[in-house]
Structure formats: structure tokens, C-alpha cells
């Protein structure tokens, strides 16, 4: 039968953000973001820019990843993206793809000058595009490296001030080594202490559009507790990942929790659309 007006608005991407503004009575910038897997971080980046531009005093950034139809899963399986044994083993030699999961998350951003002791500080972020790579959905290591360096520059940080990175880490044969190489190039040259690298997807799967929000929650807990979570399902490190990270312990991929990574933490989210995002996070009041 004919679609109801509720269905027409209920499954419209533009209305997803508009509905929040309607319910909360917000009149500032309101944008729905779809850059595939990087959507959450691009939304956070956009909210931070709006605050810095004086367009609003605070911003609500939300992300939703729901599996309401079988077609996307069938397509991802046909493309060889999904783990055949249903386990996302990021960084592991036996990694064979990711597992789709669901998630919903929301956060409020406001200027640090408003006062928020003990809160998480977004000191800098960057959004870029893979551009020309091996294929439309293939990662581009050079673009990733440029993204990480750009985010550090916005934050005014040197690589040595970054104690860890919450990586995109999909557990794919191409994605993991590529990302390891870009992190090593941006963060690991001349380090005196290892860069602690993690990925939430090994624990909860890939929430896709909401995956960046899951990463943000993990980074928040790590920074507020001064501890780095271990990489679940990591048994034998992928030789290509080891090679790209470099010799001499330039980066640590802990299978058990670490006491501390120290300093700021990077957070990555890469969309298979080619749109990629990275941000630098720390605790308000920390150096």
C-alpha cells in the first residue's frame, strides 16, 4: 500500500538530525552526515568546527548503526569483507575480515572555556579523502598518514606527545597492514616510548556509521582511567603489521591491558567511501 507520512520521514537521512533539533528545540546548524564508516567522527569534527566558528555554544553529535535489512550484509560478504568464522581478529595473523554489529551513541560538545573539569578535550581533528587508490573502497596509506599529521598540526602536538591510537582496525588483510604503516610513518619515527595501538572492533565488531562513536567511548575510558585496553583475539601478530610498524618496539599491540600510554590519544575512522577522519583527544586540564 501507499507509504505513510511517518515512513517517508522515518527512513530519510536528512530527517535523522532534523528530528533531534525538533525535539530539543535547537536552532543552530543541523546536518546529517553519511561518509560510511567515518560518519561519527566527521559529525564530531563538524560540530567542533561550528563551535569554533561561533555558530553555536554547544553541539550534539550522534551516530547510529543498525542492521535492518539483509542486503548490505550479503553485499559485504560477496566482497570478501566479512570474517568467515564470525570473529574480528584485528592485527592477528589469522585476521580474515570484520563482523557487522549495531550501535547507537551520542555526545555533547562545548567549548573548553565553558569549564568541564575531568571531561574529554578534542584538541584537534582533520577530515580528508583517500582520493585515487587501488580501488574505490581500498585504503590509501599516504592519505592516511597525511590525515594523522594534519590532525596533530591542528592540535599543536608533536608525535611524541601522543601515547596511543585507537585505530580503525577492521581486521582485513589489506586494511590492517596499510593502517599500521600510516601510523608508523606519522607517529613512530624517533619515539622513545612505544605507541600503544588498539581497536574496539575486535571486541564489539564493526558498527560502521557508529563505529567512531564506539572508539570515542573507548578512548574516553582509557584516558580517564590512565590505562590502555588490550587487543582481544590477538594471538599471533600479522607479519605484515609487524613489518609496517617497524622494528624496535615502535608500537605496542597489547594482548593484555597496559598500565598507561600517557599523553594524548589519537582516534581514527576510515569510511569505505574514501572519507577518512582522525582526532586528537586528551583530558581537560592535562598537558
Regions found by a protein language model. Name each.
Residues 1-287:
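Condensing-enzyme catalytic core of the thiolase-fold
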Amino acid at each position: 500500500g501507499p507509504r505513510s507520512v511517518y515512513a517517508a520521514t522515518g527512513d530519510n537521512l536528512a530527517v535523522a538530525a532534523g528530528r533531534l533539533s525538533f525535539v530539543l528545540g535547537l536552532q543552530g546548524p543541523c546536518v546529517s552526515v553519511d561518509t560510511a564508516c567515518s560518519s561519527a567522527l566527521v559529525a564530531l569534527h563538524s560540530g567542533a568546527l561550528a563551535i569554533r566558528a561561533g555558530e553555536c555554544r554547544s553541539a550534539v553529535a550522534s551516530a547510529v548503526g543498525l542492521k535492518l535489512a539483509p542486503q548490505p550484509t550479503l553485499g559485504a560478504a560477496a566482497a570478501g569483507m566479512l570474517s568467515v568464522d564470525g570473529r574480528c581478529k584485528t592485527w592477528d595473523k589469522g585476521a580474515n575480515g570484520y563482523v557487522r554489529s549495531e550501535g547507537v551513541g551520542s555526545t555533547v560538545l562545548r567549548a573548553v572555556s565553558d569549564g568541564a573539569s575531568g571531561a574529554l578535550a578534542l584538541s584537534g581533528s582533520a577530515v580528508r579523502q583517500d582520493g585515487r587508490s587501488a580501488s574505490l573502497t581500498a585504503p590509501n596509506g599516504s592519505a592516511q598518514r597525511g590525515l594523522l599529521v594534519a590532525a596533530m598540526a591542528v592540535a599543536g602536538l608533536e608525535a611524541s606527545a601522543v601515547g596511543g591510537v585507537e585505530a580503525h582496525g577492521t581486521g582485513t588483510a589489506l586494511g590492517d597492514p596499510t593502517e599500521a604503516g600510516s601510523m608508523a610513518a606519522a607517529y613512530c619515527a624517533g619515539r622513545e616510548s612505544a605507541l600503544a595501538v588498539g581497536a574496539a572492533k575486535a571486541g564489539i565488531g564493526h558498527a560502521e556509521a557508529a563505529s567512531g562513536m564506539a572508539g570515542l567511548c573507548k578512548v574516553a575510558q582509557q584516558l580517564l582511567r590512565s590505562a590502555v585496553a588490550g587487543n582481544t583475539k590477538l594471538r599471533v601478530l600479522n607479519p605484515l603489521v609487524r613489518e609496517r610498524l617497524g622494528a624496535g618496539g615502535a608500537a605496542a599491540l597489547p594482548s593484555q591491558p597496559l598500565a598507561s600510554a600517557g599523553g594524548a590519544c589519537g582516534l581514527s575512522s576510515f569510511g569505505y567511501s574514501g572519507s577518512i577522519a582522525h582526532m586528537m583527544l586528551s583530558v581537560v586540564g592535562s598537558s
